């Protein structure tokens, strides 16, 4: 086994990794500042970033790390002469013609780019084959929905990076659990990346389920379990507290035009801390954190529910997400009145449908392994159980959320689905009457990678804001459930019609 592990890091491995880095640069990072126009939640996140840059106190529905990174990109690159136009509002509008998005979008696009290399390493640990790993990376590199969203000043770029990092560290921890120093390192890093997830978006809480999976592998060694918990908690608390402390320490200035005269429903104790300039004190930390959690709960209670009867509803039911429904038109414009540029959250159907099929096949493999154990047992049954359980648990969790959710909320299970697809590839030994050799799997994966690339190119205009005629747009609306609608069309959701909205 050790020889097999050492043979992973060959010249071929680094060449294929370089190939993945280059391709993902071209899809995620190249000219990420285009279009030079705001879309979707950038109005909110740029306003939040400017508050950090100007020391303005505020609270928001999401934890602070993603928005701190958006602000850091603008601080580092500094492409704009001003960074204070929107400190008096939570929703930035009327962007000047020369406004540059290069700084605000930097970290989302940058981390989105490097997520591909982390996925390559995950696939390498599973397949032990750099060629297979590079083509499996096509699932991420050429997915149109991930690309268009992550290239914006959004939270999903950092979130996907941290989630991918946690999966990678989880696999490395399991692989090196017999080597004490590496085990302690990966245990600490697991806490660090989980803290990064939880300070970016609370939706990433589902990754807490990787901890019981680690404990299961460590049983019955109570001493090792104790060391794991100590390292994990140290890593988690150090980052979690540091991120929130930076958020509180930066917010010293109250701007009265913001909600609740700039206090965002802060408690009297927090108002006193603001008045005396003590928000950076660690003694103030519990008070400010309590208020921040209270505001998150308050904000989500006020968020509307999904209403498919609304003609402008962009949300979608969670059970539609695996097949790419519903697409979202982020923005559009027409250069000449005959063609139209769209920025659309539209899936690569080959990626999403293949991933969903892999999840279904994984469930079948697991059920079959228990009900009718095959002569050759599953090689990766534990990992299949972990990641299929993670995928299913996400949907159980979101099914209990009453507020409206959107297609990009599926990005976390989609990422997990990519890992499941790699595990299924390694487990499937026969296809009908044919035995699947390693060469057969490689050939099949190359064909699939080619289909992914062709599909990516087909939907490329909707990803990179390229002009289309109405006829060209209509040819891309393959599945009605996507509701891929041109500027001249009307969204008619089949579920809403069935509910008889009274239109």
Regions found by a protein language model. Give the residues of each.
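Short helix- or helix-capping micro-motifs
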Residues: 20-24, 136-141, 148, 168, ...
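Aromatic-rich transmembrane-lumenal/periplasmic boundary elements in polytopic membrane proteins
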Residues: 35-68, 72-75, 240-320, 467-482
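Short acidic/glycine- and proline-prone juxtamembrane loop motifs at membrane-interface regions
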Residues: 39-40, 145-159, 200-203
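Interfacial juxtamembrane loops and adjacent helix segments
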Residues: 58-109, 308-315, 320-322, 327-344, ...
């Amino acid at each position: 086994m050790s020889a097999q592990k050492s043979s992973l890091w060959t010249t071929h491995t680094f060449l294929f990794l370089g190939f993945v880095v280059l391709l993902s640069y071209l899809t995620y990072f190249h000219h990420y500042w285009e279009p030079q126009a705001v879309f979707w939640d950038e109005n909110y996140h740029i306003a939040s970033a400017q508050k950090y840059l100007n020391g303005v106190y505020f609270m928001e529905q999401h934890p602070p790390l993603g928005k701190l990174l958006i602000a850091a990109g603008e601080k580092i690159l500094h492409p704009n002469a001003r960074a204070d136009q929107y400190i008096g509002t939570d929703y930035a509008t009327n962007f000047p013609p020369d406004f540059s998005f290069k700084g605000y979008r930097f970290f989302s696009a940058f981390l989105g780019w490097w997520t591909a290399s982390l996925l390559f390493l995950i696939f390498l640990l599973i397949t032990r084959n750099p060629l297979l790993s590079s083509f499996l990376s096509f699932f991420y590199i050429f997915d149109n929905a991930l690309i268009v969203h992550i290239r914006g000043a959004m939270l999903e770029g950092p979130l996907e990076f941290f989630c991918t990092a946690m999966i990678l560290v989880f696999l490395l921890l399991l692989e090196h659990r017999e080597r004490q120093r590496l085990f302690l390192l990966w245990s600490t890093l697991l806490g660090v990346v989980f803290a990064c997830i939880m300070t970016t978006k609370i939706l990433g809480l589902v990754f807490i389920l990787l901890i019981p999976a680690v404990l299961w592998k460590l049983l019955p060694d109570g001493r090792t379990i104790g060391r794991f918990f100590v390292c994990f908690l140290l890593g988690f608390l150090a980052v979690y507290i540091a991120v929130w402390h930076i958020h509180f320490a930066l917010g010293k200035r109250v701007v009265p035009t913001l909600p609740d005269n700039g206090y965002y429903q802060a408690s009297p104790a927090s108002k006193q801390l603001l008045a005396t300039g003590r928000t950076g004190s660690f003694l103030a930390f519990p008070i400010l954190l309590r208020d921040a959690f209270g505001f998150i709960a308050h904000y989500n209670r006020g968020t509307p529910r999904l209403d498919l009867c609304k003609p402008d509803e962009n949300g979608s039911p969670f059970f539609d997400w695996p097949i790419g429904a519903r697409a979202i038109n982020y923005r559009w414009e027409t250069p000449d009145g005959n063609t139209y540029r769209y920025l659309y959250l539209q899936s690569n159907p080959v990626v999403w449908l293949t991933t969903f099929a892999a999840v279904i096949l994984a469930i079948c493999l697991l059920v079959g392994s228990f009900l009718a154990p095959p002569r050759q047992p599953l090689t990766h049954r534990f990992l299949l159980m972990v990641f299929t359980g993670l995928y299913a648990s996400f949907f159980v969790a979101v099914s209990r959320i009453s507020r409206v959710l959107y297609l990009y909320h599926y990005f976390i299970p989609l990422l997990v689905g990519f890992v499941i697809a790699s595990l299924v590839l390694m487990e499937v030994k026969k296809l009908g009457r044919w035995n699947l050799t390693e060469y057969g799997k490689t050939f099949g994966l190359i064909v699939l990678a080619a289909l992914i690339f062709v599909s990516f190119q087909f939907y490329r205009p909707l990803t990179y804001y390229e002009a289309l005629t109405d006829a060209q747009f209509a040819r891309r609306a393959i599945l009605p459930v996507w509701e891929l609608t041109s500027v001249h069309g009307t969204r008619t959701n089949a579920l809403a019609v069935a509910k008889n909205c009274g239109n």
